[in-house]
Structure formats: C-alpha cells, structure tokens
Amino acid sequence: YQMDFWLDEGGAFLNCRMRVVNHNPDVTPMYWWSNMAVPEYEGGRVIVPAESAYSSGGGSVYKVPVPVVDGIDISYYQNIPGQVDYFFNIPEEAPRYIANVAPDGYGLLQYSTRRLRGRKLFTWGNNSASARWQEYLTEEAGRYVEIQAGLGKTQYGCIPMAPHTAWEWLGRYGAVTLSGRSDSFEEEREGLTAMVRDEAGETLEKTLRDSHGWAMKPGKVVYRGSGYADLENACRVRRGEEPLSPHLD
C-alpha cells in the first residue's frame, strides 16, 4: 500500500491519498478502515448521511434505524449505555462523510471519494467499565469515541480484490463549524450533506485522478524499513513475476 499526504495552498483540510495493490495472480481478501479517535464532547453528536446501520449482539448481525435505536438517539453518543459498533448504511448516491460535532457546531469532518464507502461509530458506552477502559487507553487524553471510514460497509468481512488490481481513493480531514444547529438529526444530516456536496462535488474525484501521475513517481527516501520487500522482489523476479511497485524504494 502507499499513502500520500498534503495540504493545499490556503486549504483547511488534510488530503490523504491511498493506494492498495494486489500484485498477485490470485484474488485476495481486502480490508481497510481509517480510524479517527475524536473527543467525546459533552452533548456531542455524530452526523452521517444514513437512515440505517448494521450492528451486532447475541451472536447475530442486524439492521437498525438511524438515529433512534430502541428509543435512544444514538447520534448523541453519550446516550449509548454500553460498548457498541454502528456501521452506517450510506446510500450509493450519497456523499461519503462522517462528522463529530460539539453543541456549538465545531468538530471534525472527514469525507472522501466514493470507493471509501463505509462509515462507523464506535463507543465504549457510559458505565464504570467503559470509563476504566478509556482511562487505561488514553491516560490523560480524556474520553473519546471512534469514527471510521472503510472500503466495506462493515468490518464483518473482507472484499474480494481481483488479481493485478490497484484501488485508489482520496480522503480529507479538517475542522468544521455548523451554524443553525437543530435537535433534528434529519435536518442536521441534510444541512451537512449539502455542505459536503458544495465542498467536494466531483472535484474530489478529479483531484484523485489528477494526482495519479505524481503519486506514481519515485520519491526521496527519508527512512528505510526492513529488507523484506527486497527479498519479496527477488523471489518474484525468480518466479518470472513483476516486482512490487517499482516507483517505491
């Protein structure tokens, strides 16, 4: 895999360009999720363009409505009593994004090109055990929830990736401030969806395409890892196969 990061001149978002390649002659199971640990704001809310989600419990996976699950508005994550994952079922035509915002409208927005289709909320919940886990994992950093973005709709399986195939996508991470807050999840979702469409539209997909050329150029080596990639390339050449990503040293 390859990861390229940059900031646009005068831009407010970090660009994260990802490339995963299956160099082999066989189908491979592919799994990718980008994980963002974000502050658990008092009265904070997760906003995502979905009307349903997948969750699990009791040995089964099931579909639930969004935002109200068993009488609880899960978009306000402090309402959630225990540890749980929600994998949001984002419609094909919807923009790919997720945001964590405080009551004053400030927070983190992540959005991406269409290939990174999945979005997830994970919380430790709000009980003594969940509080202890957060203390153990973060020390002085404070309470957090996880918002994630992935290639699949859920983390319950992998996606078949065809032989000799490359998948690329572009994600952006940055601060967002929402005005005219509403207690209605639907209104907040519609407002942020419109904002992301205006911000990204087709320009994000175009940026991904336009950046392909320089992403494939050799770069300056600033740190060398282990030699196992060289060993793998030597084995591939011996088998008469193409080496791994020759533009990467």
Which ranges hold each PLM region?
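Catalytic micro-motifs at enzyme active sites that drive phosphoryl/nucleotidyl and oxygen chemistry
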Residues: 2-7, 156-158
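Short, well-ordered beta-strand segments enriched in hydrophobic/aromatic residues
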Residues: 3-5, 14-22, 171
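Non-catalytic surface loops within mature trypsin-like serine protease
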Residues: 9, 22, 175-177
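A contiguous, surface-exposed recognition patch within enzymatic or periplasmic domains that forms
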Residues: 12, 23-165, 219-221, 226-227, ...
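Short Pro-Gly-centered flexible turn/kink motifs
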Residues: 18, 160-177
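Charged, amphipathic alpha-helical linkers/stalks
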Residues: 169-243
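Amphipathic alpha-helical repeat scaffolds of TPR domains
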Residues: 248-249
